[in-house]
Every structure is written in structure tokens, then in C-alpha cells.
């Protein structure tokens, strides 16, 4: 099974591109990293996603992907703002807003709430240790949702747990992933990345070495072994001080975990069967 992971940027550039890791889930517990791709624009990324799976070569062109961006908003927020509570209608409404309108409405929502509880959370945020999907800064995941999810939907992929049965191309499956969840489980709160060159320290490099070693050995909560055949590729993962390439690889492993669950008969790819279909769920997070 072909698997992929995506470290997303809502405003990609040549310096800070969208990064994707492509690989293959072998029988057993091994995931082979085959290729790293970079996209300097949303249009280029969308064009890649929209490539249809070839029915005659489904094993080669079909994929299950883990994408590091939110796929939904907190139900509490949606209901408070009187937005549609059907996921598709809610996402249509959200896509039609400007970033400024999103920021203003979310800031007003937070301003009316007590200190310590400014943001609304999805049910998956706690188990995953993820930021609220309504945050517009540090990190701006609300804008990632706004920029990325409409392109996934336009590409016609299947979104388990969110779409109705039969919607989307079941040979191209997209799941919400979060690399920080696996990284913390392996190296705790050690920082392994920074977008600021001055903060890309030897200590963070050593944390990447430790994290990658756990992925390659299988000594991680997913019990999957990452195989990297090209030493050059391994060096690229370790040398990337931003951590984007390593994050894409972690998302790929989370997608592989989900693909294995599907192969065992789980139509929701390991997602909880009682998940909130408005909010969605981060793959591999335990309910």
C-alpha cells in the first residue's frame, strides 16, 4: 500500500514549501520511505492531489495520506457562531470567509470567555495534545484549515469519518495527522526543530537523531519500522533544522498505521467509531 505524509503550509514558498513524504507499507511492520516532494505553491500541491488513481494500477497509484492540518472546527465554536452543524455545509461556509473575517469572529468569541478557557477545543485535541483548530496564531492552524481542506475536497479524495458513505475516491484517502503527538511520545518535550536558523542548534539536531532512530528501530508507539535505503535521504531528514521533512515522514507513518487498520477490516482507518462527524479526529490519537 502506498502511503504519504504531508507537512502543510498555508502560504508555501520556495523557502518554506509544503513537504510530502511518499512511501510504501510492506507486509508486517515496515514502511519504506521512497521519495520527498516539495511544493512552493498551493496550486502545485492541489494539482498533485487531484491526480486520479489508475484503476488498472491501483496498487501503485492509490494512497492513504496523513495531512498535518485540521479537518474540522470545535462543535462548541460552530454552535456559538450559529454556523451549519453539518460538516460539509460548515466547511463550505468557512471556505467562503476571508482570513480577516475568521480572525475577527474568533477573537470576539475568545474575548467573551474567561481567562484559561479562551479557545474552544475538539474532542480529539486532548488525546492528541494538539492546538485548538480555531487558533489563528502560534500556530495559525485555523488558516491551515482554511487554505488546505478546500483543496483536499476539490481533489475528490475520501475523508473517513467526515464524508457520507460513497463520497470521495476511496483509492485516495486523506486523514488528519499530527506529528507532534508521536514525537512527544518518543523524545518527550525535547525540541527538535525551529523555523528560525539561529535556533537550529546542535541540541535540536541531536533530538532529530534520537527521534529518527526510534522511527527506524520500531521503538515507537505505532510499532512501525521506517526503512530508508538512501543515506542521502537520511541526511536530508537530519539536516533540515525546520523539521518539515521529518514531520512529513511521521505523518506518513501515521497514515501507514491507519492503512494497516483498514487492511484488517476497519472502514474508519482506526478512527473512533463514535467520533463527532463535525469535528473529525486526529489519526492514531486514542479516544
Which residues does each predicted region cover?
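RNase H-like (RuvC/DEDD) metal-dependent nuclease/polynucleotide-processing core
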Residues: 1-4, 8-287
Amino acid at each position: 500500500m502506498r502511503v504519504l505524509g504531508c507537512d502543510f503550509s498555508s502560504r508555501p514558498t520556495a523557502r518554506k514549501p509544503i513537504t510530502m513524504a511518499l512511501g510504501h507499507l510492506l507486509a508486517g511492520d515496515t514502511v519504506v520511505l521512497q521519495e520527498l516532494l516539495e511544493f512552493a505553491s498551493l496550486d502545485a500541491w492541489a494539482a498533485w492531489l487531484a491526480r486520479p488513481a489508475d484503476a488498472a494500477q491501483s496498487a501503485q497509484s492509490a494512497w492513504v495520506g496523513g495531512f498535518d492540518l485540521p479537518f474540522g472546527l470545535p462543535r462548541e465554536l460552530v454552535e456559538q457562531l450559529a454556523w451549519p452543524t453539518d460538516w460539509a455545509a460548515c466547511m463550505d461556509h468557512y471556505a467562503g470567509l476571508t482570513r480577516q473575517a475568521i480572525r475577527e469572529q474568533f477573537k470576539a468569541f475568545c474575548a467573551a470567555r474567561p481567562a484559561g478557557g479562551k479557545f474552544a477545543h475538539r474532542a480529539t485535541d486532548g488525546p492528541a495534545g494538539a492546538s485548538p483548530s480555531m487558533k489563528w496564531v502560534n500556530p495559525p492552524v485555523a488558516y491551515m484549515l482554511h487554505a488546505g481542506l478546500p483543496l483536499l475536497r476539490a481533489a475528490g479524495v475520501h475523508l473517513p469519518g467526515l464524508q457520507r458513505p460513497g463520497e470521495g475516491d476511496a483509492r485516495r484517502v486523506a486523514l488528519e495527522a499530527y506529528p507532534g503527538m508521536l514525537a512527544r511520545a518518543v523524545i518527550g518535550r525535547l525540541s527538535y526543530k525551529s523555523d528560525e536558523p539561529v535556533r537550529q542548534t546542535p541540541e535540536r539536531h541531536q533530538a532529530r537523531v534520537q527521534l529518527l532512530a526510534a522511527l527506524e528501530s520500531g521503538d515507537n508507539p505505532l510499532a512501525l519500522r521506517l526503512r530508508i535505503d538512501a543515506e542521502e535521504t537520511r541526511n536530508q531528514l537530519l539536516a533540515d533544522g525546520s523539521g518539515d521533512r521529518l514531520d512529513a515522514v511521521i505523518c506518513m507513518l501515521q497514515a501507514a498505521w491507519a492503512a494497516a487498520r483498514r487492511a484488517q477490516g476497519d472502514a474508519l482507518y482506526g478512527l473512533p467509531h463514535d467520533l463527532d462527524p463535525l469535528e473529525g479526529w486526529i489519526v492514531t490519537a486514542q479516544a
